Amino acid sequence: MLSAQERAQIAQVWDLIAGHEAQFGAELLLRLFTVYPSTKVYFPHLSACQDATQLLSHGQRMLAAVGAAVQHVDNLRAALSPLADLHALVLRVDPANFPLLIQCFHVVLASHLQDEFTVQMQAAWDKFLTGVAVVLTEKYR
């Protein structure tokens, strides 16, 4: 459960990301593929070039899902249920990859926001993204 202050910090950071989802998402994916090359197996169709159209498109979709989670922080299950079904039942993404993605997301945020991304904001985002990952992995059996 997120405190009112944590929710405000998440919304504050999201306001800085909004409108740049494709760029943040593409950078997140590139960092994930670079640091954890085994994750590329789920994205064989994506080029490892930050301005690649498909990479930007998938980055946009990923961060749109994060944005939906930010908007529905009180009901993540309902907001993310279709995405959870997709990852667990169709794509069969190894749930061990979600913490790797979270780690890379923190680095992308910190690299862009620098001093604005305080320890408290990082903690709030970690708690929030961990909650998102929990919801996304609930459908695994």
Curated annotation (Swiss-Prot):
Binding site for heme b: 58, 87
One CC-aspect GO term: haptoglobin-hemoglobin complex
Top-rank taxon, per record: Eukaryota
Record's keyword terms, sorted: Heme, Iron, Metal-binding, Oxygen transport, Transport
GO biological process: cellular oxidant detoxification; hydrogen peroxide catabolic process
Example GO molecular function: oxygen carrier activity
Tissues/organs with expression: Expressed in erythroid tissues.
All residue ranges annotated as the Globin domain in the record: 1-141
Pfam families named in the record: Globin
Family: Belongs to the globin family.
Protein name: Hemoglobin subunit mu
Organism the protein comes from: Homo sapiens (Human)
Name of the coding gene: HBM
